[in-house]
Amino acid sequence: MCPKHLLYFRNKLNAWRDELIIESQETLDHLRSEIRDVGDDAERASRESDNILELRTRDRYRKLLNKIDAALKRIEDGSYGYCEETGEEIGLGRLEARPIATLTVDAQERREMFQRQFRDDH
């Protein structure tokens, strides 16, 4: 991958990372304020349900941040944009759509097919 593309994806990943960190902080701030402002039991139950959803979202953000950090490390070590299974280049279109991709479309489809077969066998 050329340096221009690497810079583009580094910037895209860093912007995505910053956005997720801000959203995570907002979620945390919201959860803290929710804890203080609880009324009756029905309201508490409703808020707890909402908080569970927010915590799940926060966990997804954490996992996504880990994948973004891994992609940034691959940019630094020169392996970004190459399939971890086949070593082939991952298409720019795929990386544009999913900059954290580690597999080509074909390799991803093979992996998903294998996982479906394994799941169906058990």
For every predicted segment, state its role.
Residues C83-G87, T104:
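Short cysteine-rich clusters marking metal-coordination/redox-active sites
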Residues I75, G87-E89:
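A generic structural signal for ordered secondary structure
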